[in-house]
Amino acid sequence: MASGSSDSLETLSPPELIGLVRRLIGEVERLGKENEKLAAGLASAKRENQELKDEIRRLKGLPPRPPMKPSGMETATDRPAPETPSAAEATPPHRRGPGVSKLSVDRTVTLTAPAPAGSRYKGYEEIIVQDIAFKPEVTLYRRERWATPDGRTVTADLPAGVVGGCGPNLHRLVLTLHFQGQMTCERIVAVLTAAGVAISKRQVVRLLTAKLDLFRAEDEAVFTVGIRASGYVSVDDTGARHAGRACYTTQFGSDRFTAFRTGPSKSRLAFLRNLLGGTALYAINAAAAAYMRAANLAHGVIDALLSADVLEFGSEAEWTAHLAALGLTELRVAPDPVRVASEAALWGAIAAEDRLGNSVILSDDAGQFHVGDHALCWVHAERLVHKLVPANDKQRNAIEVAKRMIWWFYGSLKEYKLAPSPQQAEVLRARFDRIFKRGGTGYVMLDRLLRRLFRNKDGLLRVLDRPEIPLNTNASENDIRTLVTKRKISGGTVSDKGRDTRDIMLGLAKTCMKLKLSFYDYLGSRLGLPSPPIPPLAGLIRPAPS
């Protein structure tokens, strides 16, 4: 029966009205489902349209569109500073810019004023003026030469710090401009040439890689002490082309040090090799056995490795030969016994040498970093919720509710770090379960994501047991940004020496900044210049709090 007019509805019997209402409800449900499909199709079309726009920008050589804006969780959960009007009123206004009280005056110049007759003398108005004398200094070294009775020639040595016709001051300036100032070799040559220095690009490159062994030893010492004594190691990685091939740079850092390591892979094997340092050591011990059991390696393989006559190997070749002798290289099963056993042996060597000490590894949930005592970044976890694309208002509201609950919980974790207690830790664990264990939000993708984050409970709540570790990897991303800037300006590296120089010098520059040291003074101290002496950086990295 048609439902065209209100008059016809009045003549309907109750059963007919019920049938009509049921048909209308079915029609509304059909239209609602169709609307959801259209909304989902519209969202998909928008994504495809944006992908096409990005591809057009790439083909035109234009810069890519900026990434998704951050949700603002970090700033929104910061505790506001207490208002102290009386203290603010008592504080005198400051002039902008760095203070001049730390400067030492090299000379004093008295300026006279053309005062007319009858003027009264009122003393001096003192103004500090800074200037710099940037000019080349050319020195002719006349080296004595002596012919010994046995036919040899003895020549006087050049002063320490002279490299290829360039003095230590020029060497320090080139290193500072390139690694801290992020200037290319061509621009350094242009600046120095304009100032009157006769220098070529080849000489600049030679200065950048000179005395690399000195800085490499200090970088290794900083890395060894930093990952063990800092209490935590925040890690991240990024792409870095080397010798025309795609490579990856891994960042290691804390609030006291930074180190970079570049290699052809970002697998867990590569990460463990970096943690182990420059030594190639494989050890089958209790830590390695626990690793293999956690990876679900076959018990027969584990028993064969544990019962072998040799349990430590000093090179990759020896370890590979041992795996082949046990027949593991011929197995085609999952998980791969060669890969898992190699990871376990490297982890066993790290544990045997106590490379990490009591440090926690903090990461963005990338799989290669999931080793040892591990913590996860809350900003990356919340970002997964922030990046969901809702198809209707119901899904949008579900996302907003989940985000607000995560924000409140993140703020509570910040407060916990200031005053940790076992009682509050249990309360926060219960709150975590209520937020991430719940279901039925009305948005399937959100429900799956919350369950995934709940499975990461141990890593996300590591801060309850170790309140000294950060809640995010923002510091790692800041360190990585230095390398990304260098990559955008200079491109990739060609030689292994150039790659190592970049990693070492950028890491030392960031370490000096975190230790509140002048990288310029540090270079002067290491190059033998009369600058403030700076002790070994590894000794300045404070031990982890007990």
Predicted regions and their residues:
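Short, flexible loop/hinge motifs at secondary-structure junctions
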Residues: 1-165, 205, 235, 282-341, ...
